Every structure is written in structure tokens, then in C-alpha cells.
Amino acid sequence: MKILQRFAALAAALTVTFASQAALAGTAAPIKARNVVLVHGAYADGSSWSEVIPLLQRAGLHVTSVQNPLTSFADDVEATRRVLALQDGPTVLVGHSYAGMVISETGNDPNVTALVYVAARAPDAGEDYVALAARFPKPPASNGLVHSGGFAQLNEEAFVHDFAGDLEPARARALYAVQGRISDALFASKTTQAAWRSKPAWYAISNNDRTTSPELERFLAKRMNATTVSIDSSHVSLISHPREIANLILAAAGLDEQR
């Protein structure tokens, strides 16, 4: 009987220990990173991070912006993996918009210590994201898609007013001129991994987003238990609110905010 009581006491002690460890893991400080890899979304290119990059470099971080070909999900994943393979040490992986799918797929790289989603898709492994998005209000920008030759882009009105609505019109039109044309099949792709299930995540919600439903963004951020900020921004908060986005990335990197 005494032996059984001792085993019961030991089991109870182990339960408390494991529970305490789990609680500590949930509140652990971010691992300090020295690299940041930025991944752009659809209708954009790597230069869309140009306002954020200097702020991160000023904090001493090594920054690389991926150039997605946007020809297929597999091609974009491979482009990001090539960049991740060049990183030396702890790395924060950041995705804007569609690139949330890319970082979810590639974020289990051993060097990746944190994920940052900026108004981004964040599907679960194998999830039909199109069906998920259909449960939320349809964003106006989707009405401006123009298809040709197996690729698509936003027309100028949708780009200026719905994609980049809080930028000066001249700036928005310049970005429209260099937008990346996407494969028609891109958005129907499915991830095989959901790195946010095993890596700490941060999420920037764009409250005035007309390209991705803000309600969908809030759902995704809550589902992944992300550290979340809400910004009164269009879909391109990385351009119109670079300081807020940079500070979110710095937090994920275990560094202090900049003013």
C-alpha cells in the first residue's frame, strides 16, 4: 500500500512539474534572432519591404527579402527555402498577404525561431483556404482581378483604392506598375505544413483591409494564438505603417522597439 502511495505521490509531482514547464513554455521570452527573412505576397515584389528593411537593419539585424516568382506555390516555397538555407543562426520569418502560406510551409526550418504574419493567410496543413475565406465578407479588391494567359493581376483602380488605399495615389500607382503577376492556380494551392502550430507567431491585422477580410485576419490570429497588433491600415501596412510592422518583427526577434 505504501509503495502505491509513493507512486501516486510521484505521479502527482511529475504532473505538476510538466504543467509548470508547459506554462513556462507558453510565456517564454522570444529567442533573440540575428536574421530576418521577409517574404512578399501577391501583386507585389521584394521591394514592398523597402520601408521596413532600414528599420530592422538599424537594430543590427541581417535582413533578406525573398523575390517570389509567383509562378506556383511550389516555386515560391523553393525560393524561400533557398534564402533560409543561407541564414546563419536564429531567424525570424515574415510573410505578407499570400506569403503567409509560404512561411507556414517553410517555417519549420530549424533556424526559424518565430513567425510574423502581416495581413497574411495562415492555413492549417491541407486546409482549403478558399473555402475558409468564403465564410467571411468578400473583400472589394477581388472584383478587380484581371486574368490573361494563365496569370492574374489587379487592375489599376482596385490596386490604388483597395490594395493600397492609404498611400498617396502617385505612390500607389508606382507600385501598381511593378506588381507581380500571379499564376491563376496560386491561391488554390494547399500547404502540407502549418509551422505556426509549433513556432511562436505574431500577427499584424489591417483594420481597413479591402484585399483580405479583417474579420478573417482576426480569426487566423486568434486560431494560432498569435501575439497580435491591430493597425488602422490598408492591406499594405508594411508600406504605410512601417514603424509598427518593424516593431512587431523586433518583438518576435527578442529585441526592443524603436521610436
Map each language-model feature to its residues.
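Post-His helix in hydrolase/transferase enzymes
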Residues: 239-255
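Flexible "cap/lid" loop of the alpha/beta hydrolase fold
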Residues: 108-156, 183-187
